UniProtKB/Swiss-Prot annotation:
Membrane topology: Peripheral membrane protein
Localization (cell): Cell inner membrane; Periplasm
Family classification: Belongs to the AlgJ family.
Keyword Cell inner membrane: yes
Pathway: Glycan biosynthesis; alginate biosynthesis
Annotated region described as Disordered, given as residue ranges: 259-286
Signal sequence extent: 1-39
The organism's place on the tree of life at top rank: Bacteria
Keyword Nucleotide-binding attached: no
EC number(s) reported in the record: 2.3.1.-
Primary gene name: algJ
GO CC annotations on file: periplasmic space; plasma membrane
Name of the protein in question: Probable alginate O-acetylase AlgJ
Function: Together with AlgI and AlgF, forms an inner membrane complex which probably interacts with the alginate polymerization-transport complex and adds acetyl groups at the O-2 and O-3 positions of mannuronate residues. Acetylation of alginate is important for the architecture of biofilms and increases resistance to opsonic killing in the host.
């Protein structure tokens, strides 16, 4: 956890920041004489006040610089950012969701019941489920964790959940070993971002592809895909938003990192007009792909190219139902209620589920509460039945 500093240093910190604020406030008063409004601006309806506010916001240094100064002092003295980020070593940043203790153990149980309920519903519809639990960035890079350590809850969270899923008959490949091996070839997670790198996404796609082929979970004619690697570009990680240091103190920020964009496309057609590696009817009687993907921004954001890497690893086209900013549960429940999914379900569904969401609460208020409760109840019922059989 974060170490405390001595009381004299705390007083010095407060005094220094207070002095800076007073100095900037005095400086800002120089901008008042420069204010002018249109001659016909009414005084009593608030327009003059709004005009002055806009002028002051533009000229007031505290408005523009105070956030930078506070963030710089927090970062340099306390090695902290805004709530949401944990500062690691060597310029690494982590989401605090991988460090927080769970509010209660019940949330993990509720989420597990939903996962089981989803599995039961997919089985009823004839859809095979592959649960891809993505190991936490902090689990893969403990060497870059700083003073703050993950709560004890996270110690065995990944392996315990994986064992639980497998015991329930859910296909859940172990992705941790593959990602650890891939670290020798480059970063599998981005230093300043919550997300994986294209290499990490490709590694997981290849591991899932091997598992699915070995277990014969997908039975479709092969379709070849090719991946093209683009130029490297500077990537600003999403965790940097919790360190509002630029433009004044951008030199304090972790060094910029490069992201090499990858794009995957179907292989070009052969001279006879047939796609390389494809059969006469790519998807049997239907043109709808028999493979689907659902999950979070790990799957939805094209920067990581997980969708493309999975297509190439499985030699099969897919429909991507993943969404950004909603976690793994909400897109899955939306999918279960999707009319097209109901009428023409895929043969196989890959559910990408980052480890950090396992004990987290999700906003499921858009769904009918009774329906969600029924899903949980069906999952819990299967769990109790399995436990009674083992007794």
């Amino acid at each position: 956890m974060t170490q405390s500093i001595s009381r004299p240093l705390q007083y010095a910190y407060i005094a220094a920041f207070g002095g800076l604020l007073l100095g900037l406030a005095g400086w800002s008063l120089k901008s008042v004489p420069g204010f002018s409004a249109a001659a016909d601006t009414p005084l009593l309806n608030g327009k003059l006040a709004h005009a002055f506010e806009a002028h002051y916001d533009k000229e007031f240094p505290i408005k523009r610089l105070g956030t930078n100064l506070w963030a710089a002092l927090d970062y340099t003295l306390f090695h902290e950012g805004r709530p949401g980020v944990v500062i690691g070593k060597d310029g690494w940043l982590f989401t605090d969701e991988e460090f927080k203790p769970a509010p209660s153990g019940q949330q993990l149980e509720d989420n597990w019941a939903l996962v089981r309920g989803v599995q039961r519903e997919l089985n009823r519809r004839g859809v095979k489920l592959v649960l891809a639990v993505i190991p936490a960035k902090a689990r893969l890079y403990p060497e870059h964790i700083g003073r703050e350590q993950p709560a004890a809850l996270h110690d065995s969270l990944y392996q315990d959940f994986l064992a639980r899923a497998r015991a329930a008959g859910i296909d859940s490949p172990d992705l941790l070993g593959s990602l650890r091996q891939a670290k020798d070839n480059g970063a599998v997670f981005l230093r300043t971002d919550t997300h994986w790198s294209p290499l990490g996404a490709e590694t997981v796609a290849q591991r899932l592809g091997a598992e699915i082929r070995e277990t014969h979970l997908l039975d479709v004619p092969a379709q070849n895909f090719v991946t093209r690697v683009g130029e490297e570009r500077t990537h600003k990680g999403d965790l940097l938003s919790f360190l509002p240091l630029d433009p004044l103190f951008d030199e304090l920020l972790p060094r910029p990192e490069q992201l090499q964009q990858r794009t995957t496309e179907a292989a070009p057609a052969l001279p006879g007009g047939q796609q390389s590696g494809a059969g006469d009817d790519l998807f049997g009687d239907s043109q709808q792909p028999r493979l689907a993907l659902v999950g979070t921004s790990y799957s939805a954001n094209p920067r990581w190219n997980f969708e493309g890497a999975l297509k190439q690893a499985l030699s099969a086209d897919l429909i991507n139902y993943a969404k950004e900013g909603k976690g793994p549960l909400e897109p899955m429940l939306e999918l279960l209620q999707d009319e097209g999914f109901r009428k023409d379900p895929p043969q196989l569904l890959v559910w990408e589920f980052p480890e950090r969401y396992l004990p987290m609460a999700s906003d499921l208020s858009q769904f009918d509460a009774d329906w969600v409760a029924q899903l949980k109840a069906s999952g819990g019922r299967d769990e109790r039945l399995a436990a009674s059989r083992n007794d």
